[in-house]
């Protein structure tokens, strides 16, 4: 037994020595390990270190990061990640920079750097022609096709990232050409944007649009993906120097490649040839969308999405007459052959068309859940304006209106020849026009200058502004946007020229339960007693204004009275002085006597307060008598006896007295509800109580904002009613 214990003791001592040796070795390894080889120092790299590692310049590094979609990161501890005493400001993931080492564009950047050195050397030797030849023939061309495939493995991924691309390209399409924004880039952006718009027109994919301060928002649905972009208004844009157009130009270079891929895929998916035919001469005349001609890949005839009349006025009239003759011949042939259509076939076709319509589910009970309703379908969008012929006046924005009308089925749109080529008709008096979009105020005909007349018949060459053609509907541009957002045709009389337009609301912001709804009336969304409180507050403000007005008039009258008294007393003194001693001053002895008498009287005077009280009471009685006399005069002028006017005043006072207990009752009820809520909160846990407090705070804030908006609307409506 003793020997066994000795062996166990030796074994423990041996193991203890091994454990101590392991601890010593681990400490040595920990001390010898370098800092910055693990943790945040290993995961992050600064921008300077990344540029040195890739061996490119800083502008090329920025371009490469934009192309590859790599952006700076924010570490938790900048001091640990920077590996230096002073923390850096810009960090990247080390893995991202390691990923960039294998990018083929690095070779192109290095070739560009070598070429720039050769060009600088040639210019230094004075060989300008050699430098131009090097720049023209040896400039490396960047291809971003492989980057598009890497960043967007599927076409749906590309559609999801199309919002920013469209917004930036539409922005550059409306910029003026400068040294920082060349005309070649602007032309490319315009062409790609028009091609994308043509796809939306051909497929009726546009769903919503909204006019805002920033520009015009559009929303389209392509393959189930909602795409929203912003188009600026066509004002004269001023290019400022505080914007770095080199970085924006890099984004434009990437987004043009992306949109080119997307347009090709979209066109081929519906059987159209990409790129579509482009008429440069027509585009120079301002045709824009009409300069493109879509062609089918599997059909012999061209797909005409836009109807234009490119003939001169005389040829257009000849074409109209020939078309009428052809139609008459076709009608005669049909009458001779007696082709009858079966009504059953027509009914079945109508049923098949109705099958594709989207059903709307409306809740039966008010307490039932409301399902999100489906949006307008492509067929309904394509037939919204299909039966109309529009004419856009010169003052209306032609480009957005043309795009919207064509996207929702309109094939015949005319405008003035000043706005450009590509219109269905340039004649404002064309009998085929059903709707005219006008955005100018109503002016009297006498204030307009005379128009030039035709030398042949003496008639005016063009209709005068403000003239109305019988049988034509005149609307303002907002009617088009509101009809599209509502998915149906609205009343045109609400949008007549000169009429006060209804509010233009965002189609993507739905009114909440506790929020303010500008479409609903005030009576439907006011809280209990809110109108009475507003009336009381308004009466109180009016009373204060009347009191302040009366006080100001009284002060003015008193000042005028004092001025008149002073003037009269001054006139009397001057006349008295002139009558005594030929205008000489009176001896000062009397003044001294009077002053001494006044001084004695001041020493002996008592009871000033009683006299002052008596004078104030007499003034009050005089004021009451004067006010009563004034009221009698007002009642007599109104044709009422004084008793009736006094009864009306007593009625208003009685109404105010009756409203006071109502306000007290509401305050008591509100206090009771708050006490009940506090009593219920006592039974909750701390977590639920905090959540309830947050909900109550947000609801109160929302209610206050809604009440403020309702109060503003109430004042506007009262002002309109007074007018």
From Swiss-Prot:
Occurrences of domain BRCT (ranges): 380-497
HAMAP family: Pescadillo (MF_03028)
Biased composition (Basic and acidic residues): 623-634, 670-681, 700-709
Residue stretches of biased makeup (Basic residues): 710-723
Keyword terms of this UniProt record: Coiled coil, Nucleus, Ribosome biogenesis, rRNA processing
One annotated Gene Ontology cellular component of this protein: nucleoplasm
Cellular compartment(s): Nucleus, Nucleolus; Nucleus, Nucleoplasm
Descriptive protein name: Pescadillo homolog
Family: Belongs to the pescadillo family.
Biased composition (Acidic residues): 537-550, 588-600, 608-622
Origin organism lineage: Eukaryota, Fungi, Dikarya, Ascomycota, Pezizomycotina
Annotated function: Component of the NOP7 complex, which is required for maturation of the 25S and 5.8S ribosomal RNAs and formation of the 60S ribosome.
Stretches assigned to coiled coil: 522-551, 656-723
Subunit structure: Component of the NOP7 complex, composed of ERB1, NOP7 and YTM1. The complex is held together by ERB1, which interacts with NOP7 via its N-terminal domain and with YTM1 via a high-affinity interaction between the seven-bladed beta-propeller domains of the 2 proteins. The NOP7 complex associates with the 66S pre-ribosome.
Gene3D superfamilies per the UniProt record, alphabetical: BRCT domain
A GO BP annotation: maturation of 5.8S rRNA from tricistronic rRNA transcript (SSU-rRNA, 5.8S rRNA, LSU-rRNA)
Taxonomic source organism: Ajellomyces capsulatus (strain NAm1 / WU24) (Darling's disease fungus)
PANTHER family: PESCADILLO - RELATED, PESCADILLO HOMOLOG
GO terms, molecular function: ribonucleoprotein complex binding; RNA binding
Disordered, as annotated region: 440-471, 501-723
């Amino acid at each position: 037994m003793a020997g066994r214990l000795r062996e166990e003791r030796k074994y423990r001592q041996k193991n203890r020595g091994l454990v101590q040796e392991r601890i010593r070795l681990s400490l040595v390894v920990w001390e010898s390990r370098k800092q910055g080889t693990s943790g945040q120092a290993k995961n992050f790299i600064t921008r300077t270190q990344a540029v040195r590692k890739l061996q490119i310049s800083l502008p090329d590094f920025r371009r490469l990061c934009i192309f590859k979609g790599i952006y700076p990161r924010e570490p938790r501890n900048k001091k640990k990640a920077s590996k230096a005493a002073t923390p850096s400001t810009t960090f990247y993931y080390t893995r991202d920079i390691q990923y960039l080492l294998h990018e083929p564009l690095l070779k192109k950047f290095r070739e560009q750097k070598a070429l720039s050195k050769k060009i600088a050397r040639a210019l230094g030797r004075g060989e300008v022609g050699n430098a131009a030849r090097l720049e023209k023939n040896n400039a490396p061309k960047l291809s971003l096709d492989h980057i598009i495939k890497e960043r967007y493995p599927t076409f749906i991924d590309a559609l999801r990232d199309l919002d920013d691309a469209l917004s930036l390209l539409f922005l550059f399409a409306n910029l003026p050409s400068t040294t920082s924004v060349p005309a070649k880039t602007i032309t490319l952006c315009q062409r790609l944007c028009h091609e994308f718009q043509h796809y939306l027109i051909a497929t009726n994919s546009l769903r919503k649009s909204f006019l805002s301060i920033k520009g015009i928002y559009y929303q389209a649905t392509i393959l189930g993906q909602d795409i929203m972009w912003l188009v600026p208004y066509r004002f004269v844009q001023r290019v400022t120097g505080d914007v770095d157009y080199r970085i924006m130009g890099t984004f434009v270079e990437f987004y043009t490649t992306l949109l080119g891929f997307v347009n090709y895929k979209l066109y081929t998916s519906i059987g159209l040839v990409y790129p579509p035919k482009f008429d440069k001469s027509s585009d120079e005349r301002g045709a824009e969308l009409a300069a493109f001609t879509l062609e089918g890949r599997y059909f012999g005839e061209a797909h005409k999405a836009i109807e234009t009349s490119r003939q001169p006025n005389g040829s257009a009239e000849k074409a109209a007459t020939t078309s009428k003759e052809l139609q008459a011949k076709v009608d005669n042939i049909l009458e001779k052959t007696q082709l009858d259509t079966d009504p059953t076939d027509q009914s079945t076709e109508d049923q098949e068309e109705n099958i594709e319509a989207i059903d709307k589910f409306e809740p039966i009970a008010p307490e039932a859940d409301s399902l999100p309703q489906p949006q307008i379908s492509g067929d309904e969008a394509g037939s919204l304006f299909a039966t109309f012929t529009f004419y856009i006046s010169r003052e209306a924005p032609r480009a957005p209106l043309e795009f919207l009308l064509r996207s929702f089925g309109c094939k015949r749109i005319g405008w003035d020849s000043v706005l450009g080529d590509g219109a269905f008709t340039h004649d404002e008096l064309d009998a085929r026009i059903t709707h005219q979009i006008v955005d100018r105020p109503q002016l009297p005909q006498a204030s307009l200058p005379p128009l030039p007349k035709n030398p042949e018949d003496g008639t005016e060459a063009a209709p005068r502004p403000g003239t109305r053609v019988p049988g034509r509907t005149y609307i303002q541009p907002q009617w088009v946007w509101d009809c599209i957002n509502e998915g149906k045709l609205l009343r045109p009389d609400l949008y007549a020229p000169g009429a006060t337009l209804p509010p233009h609301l965002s189609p993507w912001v739905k009114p909440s339960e506790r929020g303010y709804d500008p479409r609903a009336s005030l009576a439907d969304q006011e809280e209990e007693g809110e109108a009475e409180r507003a009336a009381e507050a308004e009466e109180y403000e009016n009373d204060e204004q009347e009191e302040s007005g009366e006080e100001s008039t009284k002060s003015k009258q008193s000042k005028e009275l004092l001025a008149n008294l002073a003037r009269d007393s001054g006139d009397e003194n001057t006349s008295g002085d002139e009558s005594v001693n030929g205008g000489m001053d009176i001896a000062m002895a009397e003044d001294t006597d009077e002053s001494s008498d006044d001084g004695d009287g001041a020493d002996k005077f008592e009871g000033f307060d009683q006299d002052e009280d008596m004078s104030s009471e007499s003034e009050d009685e005089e004021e009451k008598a004067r006010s009563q006399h004034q009221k009698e005069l007002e009642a007599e002028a109104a044709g009422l006896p004084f008793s009736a006017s006094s009864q009306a005043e007593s009625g208003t006072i009685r109404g105010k007295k009756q409203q006071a207990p109502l306000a007290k009752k509401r305050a008591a009820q509100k206090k009771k509800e708050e006490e009940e809520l506090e009593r219920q909160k006592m039974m909750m846990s701390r977590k639920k109580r905090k959540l309830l407090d947050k909900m109550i705070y947000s609801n109160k804030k929302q209610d206050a904002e809604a009440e403020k908006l309702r109060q503003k609307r109430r004042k506007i409506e009262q002002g309109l009613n007074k007018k």
